[in-house]
Amino acid sequence: MSVSKKDVEYVAELARLEFKEEEKDNFVNDLNKILNYMEKLDELNTDDVDIVVNPYYIENKYREDNVEKSMELKEVIDNAPENLEEYVIVPKVID
């Protein structure tokens, strides 16, 4: 399989793109290099290779939900740069 200049012109027309003749020639050359590389990959025997990633076999890894001691409210308020009673004042993020 190879890409011709006519193929590049057709796709460019569909995408409403305009290219110089030199650019078209470069595209033909680059696309043919890619296709040749893919053909080489097709020759590779992968019968004995295990599937490395398959989204159908991925499982969620859940952790235990353990309650742990956290900071006391007074300690949080004392460490906050600004506070209003029991609330920490933070800079405005969204206008």
From Swiss-Prot:
InterPro entries: Asp/Glu-ADT_sf_sub_c, GatC. One of its GO terms (molecular function) is glutaminyl-tRNA synthase (glutamine-hydrolyzing) activity. One of its GO terms (biological process) is translation. SUPFAM superfamilies: Glu-tRNAGln amidotransferase C subunit (SSF141000). Pfam families: GatC. It catalyses: L-glutamyl-tRNA(Gln) + L-glutamine + ATP + H2O = L-glutaminyl-tRNA(Gln) + L-glutamate + ADP + phosphate + H(+); L-aspartyl-tRNA(Asn) + L-glutamine + ATP + H2O = L-asparaginyl-tRNA(Asn) + L-glutamate + ADP + phosphate + 2 H(+). Its EC number is 6.3.5.-. Disulfide bonds: none annotated. Keywords: ATP-binding, Ligase, Nucleotide-binding, Protein biosynthesis. It comes from the Bacteria. Signal peptide: none annotated. Allows the formation of correctly charged Asn-tRNA(Asn) or Gln-tRNA(Gln) through the transamidation of misacylated Asp-tRNA(Asn) or Glu-tRNA(Gln) in organisms which lack either or both of asparaginyl-tRNA or glutaminyl-tRNA synthetases. The reaction takes place in the presence of glutamine and ATP through an activated phospho-Asp-tRNA(Asn) or phospho-Glu-tRNA(Gln). PANTHER family: GLUTAMYL-TRNA(GLN) AMIDOTRANSFERASE SUBUNIT C, MITOCHONDRIAL. Heterotrimer of A, B and C subunits. HAMAP family: GatC. Belongs to the GatC family. This is Aspartyl/glutamyl-tRNA(Asn/Gln) amidotransferase subunit C. It comes from Clostridium botulinum (strain Loch Maree / Type A3). The gene is gatC.
